[in-house]
Amino acid sequence: MNLQYLILSLLSTTVYGGFNLNFDSKGDALEKAAIDFTGEDVAVIKENERESFGITDGPLKDACGKVSGRRPDHVWLYKPTLWGDMYTMYKWPEVTRTLTPIAARVVGKEQKPMIVSSQVYRNRSNRTVKVNGKISQEVTNTVENKWSKTHGLSVTASMTYSFKVVEASMEIGYTSEWGQEETKSESVAVGQEMGFESELQPGESVEAVLSATKGSMIIDVTYRATLDGCCAINYNNGWKGHHYYCYPIGMVQDAGKLKKHVDVKETIKIGFYSDSHVIVRDKHGKK
C-alpha cells in the first residue's frame, strides 16, 4: 500500500481556539511523513494544576523570596486576593496555563499480508464447467488512543478526530474530550469486486482465497503546558517601600528552579486493511 493516501486530522475546539493536526505520509518511508499541527487551550490556572508545576504555596513563596530578597507573607496566582483584589486594582495579568501540541510523529508501522477468507468450488457434474464467482469478507478498521498521565491538568477542550485511509476505504470520525481514551471502529467489505473465472473438469475443485494487507500505524502526539502572567505578593510590613508586588511567573520559576512545563503524550493507533486480491488454486495449492 502506498501510504501517501493516509490522512489523519485532529481538531479540538475551545473558547480560545483549537487543536488541528494533519498527517500525510509521503510514501512508505517514515522519514518522509509530514505532520502539521496548530492550536492551543488557554485558561486561568486551577488550584490542582499548581501541584503539577510545583508551585504550591510554600515553594512559590520561597521562589518569590529569591526574586525579591525576602520571602513574602502572601502569594496569589489569580483573583480574588485580599485587600481589594490586586489583580483587578492594578490590572495585573492572572497566571494562565497554555496547552499546545508541540510534536507529532509516526513511531511505528506494520504491514503484513493475511488470508481474510476462502471458499472451495467443486465440479460434481460429469462434464466440464466454468465457475464464475466473487468473494468478499467484512473486516474492521480501528482507531484507538491512549494517554500518558495528564499530570493534574484541567483541560476541558473537546476534540474532534477524523481518520481517512483512501486505499483501505477507511473513514472514521468522532468527538471526544481531551484526556479521554476511546476505541472506534468501522466495518467494511473487502473483495466485493474481486471476481474470478475457472474451468473445472468433472470431480475437480478449486479454492478461492481472498487476501489483504493488514496495516497499523502508531502516532505519538506531545502536548506541552506552560504558564504566563504574574504572581501577586504581599509583605505585611512592607518591603523596599511597598506592600504589594507583581512578579512574572517565568522569573519566579527560574529563581526557584521550578518546573517550567508539563508534557502529556497521546498515542494513536490506526488499524486498517488494504490491497485485497483473490488467488484461485487447486487442491495441490497450484495457482
UniProtKB/Swiss-Prot annotation:
Disulfide bond residue pairs: none
Organism: Megalopyge opercularis
CDD domains in the cross-refs: PFM_spherulin-2a-like (cd20235)
MF terms in GO: toxin activity
Protein name: U-megalopygitoxin(8)-Mo12
Chain's role: May function as a large pore-forming protein.
Tissues expressed in: Expressed by the venom apparatus.
Sorted UniProt keywords: Amidation, Disulfide bond, Membrane, Secreted, Signal, Target cell membrane, Target membrane, Toxin
Position of the signal peptide: 1-17
Family designation: Belongs to the megalysin family.
GO CC annotation: extracellular region; membrane; other organism cell membrane
PTM per Swiss-Prot/TrEMBL: Contains 2 disulfide bonds.
Compartments, as annotated in UniProt: Secreted; Target cell membrane
Entry-annotated residues carrying Histidine amide: H284
